[in-house]
């Protein structure tokens, strides 16, 4: 998808408006921001962006613009040192799954590596649907970060101690010392996908 410089500017404006207002801009707002003579010029640029697959236009709505990259769920691969888990450099494409199929809704997919959770049916290569949150209840399966390593384990808190429990007797629990390692809960498991899933990008 090759965009002209102007199309890229408009796409960036749509993204920034979504981040600030929580909604896409109107044609009038785009025209005003870029000094177009009328909203029709903005409409022409939007149609060009839609034709190139960067956005989806929803007729009948003044703010009926949807970013294609918002469709589906991002797959997180290896997590770059020091980066947020949803940083662009960690993403390995997007998959055609509706986030609202999960409760609470899924924010990303994580490819499972290893056999530490096989006793609860989570196998190497599965896609784990994860709701991004730093809050988790005792006993929930979490995606946790220990320094720069991301792991999937069951959370257990007892006597002021945090333990990450594997669901495989071959693996010892991980006892977390927050003084010694950089520990953070990145999310909770809300579903599991195994088998063919359509990739969007």
Swiss-Prot record:
PANTHER family with a match to the protein in the record: LEXA REPRESSOR, LEXA REPRESSOR-RELATED
Name of the protein: LexA repressor
Family: Belongs to the peptidase S24 family.
Secretion signal span: none
Function summary: Represses a number of genes involved in the response to DNA damage (SOS response), including recA and lexA. In the presence of single-stranded DNA, RecA interacts with LexA causing an autocatalytic cleavage which disrupts the DNA-binding part of LexA, leading to derepression of the SOS regulon and eventually DNA repair.
Reactions it catalyzes: Hydrolysis of Ala-|-Gly bond in repressor LexA
HAMAP family referenced in this protein's UniProt entry, alphabetically: LexA (MF_00015)
Gene3D superfamilies with a match to the protein in the record: Umud Fragment, subunit A (2.10.109.10), Winged helix-like DNA-binding domain superfamily/Winged helix DNA-binding domain (1.10.10.10)
Site positions for Cleavage: 81-82
DNA-binding feature ranges: 27-47
InterPro entries: LexA (IPR006200), LexA-like (IPR039418), LexA/Signal_pep-like_sf (IPR036286), LexA_DNA-bd_dom (IPR006199), LexA_repressor (IPR050077), Peptidase_S24_LexA (IPR006197), Peptidase_S24_S26A/B/C (IPR015927), WH-like_DNA-bd_sf (IPR036388)
Keyword Transcription recorded: yes
């Amino acid at each position: 998808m090759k965009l002209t410089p102007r199309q890229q500017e408009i796409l960036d404006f749509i993204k920034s408006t979504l981040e600030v207002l929580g909604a896409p801009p109107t044609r009038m707002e785009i025209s005003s921001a870029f000094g177009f003579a009328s909203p029709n010029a903005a409409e022409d640029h939007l149609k060009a962006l839609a034709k190139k697959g960067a956005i989806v236009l929803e007729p009948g709505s003044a703010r009926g613009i949807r970013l294609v990259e918002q469709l589906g769920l991002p797959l997180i691969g290896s997590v770059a040192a020091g980066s947020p888990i949803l940083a662009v450099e960690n993403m390995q494409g997007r998959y055609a799954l509706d986030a609202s199929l999960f409760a609470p809704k899924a924010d990303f997919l994580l490819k499972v590596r290893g056999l530490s959770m096989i006793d609860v049916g989570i196998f190497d290569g599965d896609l784990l649907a994860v709701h991004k949150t730093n809050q988790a209840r005792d006993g929930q399966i979490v995606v946790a970060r220990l320094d720069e390593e991301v792991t999937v384990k069951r959370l257990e808190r007892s006597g002021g101690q945090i333990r990450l429990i594997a669901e495989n007797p071959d693996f010892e629990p991980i006892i977390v010392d927050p003084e010694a390692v950089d520990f953070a809960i990145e999310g909770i498991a809300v579903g599991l996908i195994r088998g063919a899933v359509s990739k969007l990008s």
